[in-house]
């Protein structure tokens, strides 16, 4: 899985978000290491929708937009399973690095 797909799914794991909120959450969680530019973000969301990992949903009740109608996205059960599998795969890599004493336990 592409790293930005994993980060997008992680951002959606707890609650529905619009594009800018996804971008901000990923940027903050990665300490600025990953910047999702609009083309990258919306291209990924379009493909992830086709794959069945996310769906577009309505804005939460009471959401105040500064204009326009932001698109909100929700992770699907399939998206959650795929994200969890990727997390397990990455955790195995971290465990291997720890066993080689490249990381502290």
Question: Can you name each region flagged by the protein language model?
Answer:
Residues 64-84:
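Basic, amphipathic "hinge/linker" alpha-helix immediately C-terminal to the N-terminal HTH DNA-binding motif
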